[in-house]
């Protein structure tokens, strides 16, 4: 109905607004017996949390998650897991000047037209603040996937504006505020963001997310293909305007002889498909990329209109991210984890007794 849930066997439902009392989510379908505490989720929440860098919004939220249900004596019970994060640093007065004004590039106009009203404070339900609960739920999925099945998920910023990562050093990702894997570009990123902030403008970014250890067989053709559900989940992240699986749009210029991921008993020779063939995981790493648009909440004046249809000028005040991609890495990881968790449980429900005599291939 209202689009607040994702998944079939591992179901995540979120609620709450940017300037409301709290954010929350319900997780249905988590298997019992998983050791789980708030600390298991807090690490990823801290990675997403606002106010941790001079290049993100100045809004300071501790984002401390509370487990309300579904955990007893430190383990999941198999019943619904209730999670809550209180909002503590709302400054709704920053938005009083746009109560009847539509910000171009935002959901103000479409929410008003769809619902006949809108919560103008920080974007309400359309704010990326809602993704805190996705990250919390994703952390539960990530722990189960790693602990029970050896599946690991990690993401990084592969491009910010014109600056692209030339090398991928996974050890660098958590060592800088950009989640950037190329240390040689950090100085350029820092300078670029300083100048951008001075100008009052914003910039887009590209985020890459990878899952390793994914078994063969996840995905439910034809309408619940694994790559289709991954794309659906990643496109549901605020500001995402494009998703690629594997080589993505790069396949347009590839020849069939170049992009077909040759096989031998020793394994696959390449992974242009991004770990999915025919909508089913191949056992290779799942590789996806997302493109995030620059936020429209900028201090550069722009033309818009009021709710009454009158012309108006917009100069956005408040605390905003000059590049929303900086905090998107843990969100992308969470969405991939939720999809993989859901498909793992679905596959187990239908196919746990299937035995194939064909060798399982890895990368050569």
Swiss-Prot record:
Decide whether keyword Ribosomal protein is in the record. Answer: no
Which domain of life does the UniProt lineage start with? Bacteria
The record's section on Pfam families has: Chorismate_synt
Write out the GO biological process terms. amino acid biosynthetic process; aromatic amino acid family biosynthetic process; chorismate biosynthetic process
Q: Which InterPro entries match?
A: Chorismate_synth, Chorismate_synth_AroC_sf, Chorismate_synthase_CS
Q: Name one GO molecular function term.
A: chorismate synthase activity
**What NCBIfam families does this protein map onto?**
aroC, PRK05382.1
Supply the name of the protein: Chorismate synthase
Free-text function comment from the UniProt entry: This reaction introduces a second double bond into the aromatic ring system.
Task: Locate the region Disordered.
Answer: 41-60
Q: Which family does it belong to?
A: Belongs to the chorismate synthase family.
Q: What is its EC number?
A: 4.2.3.5
Pathway listed for it is: Metabolic intermediate biosynthesis; chorismate biosynthesis; chorismate from D-erythrose 4-phosphate and phosphoenolpyruvate: step 7/7
Keyword line: Amino-acid biosynthesis, Aromatic amino acid biosynthesis, FAD, Flavoprotein, FMN, Lyase, NADP
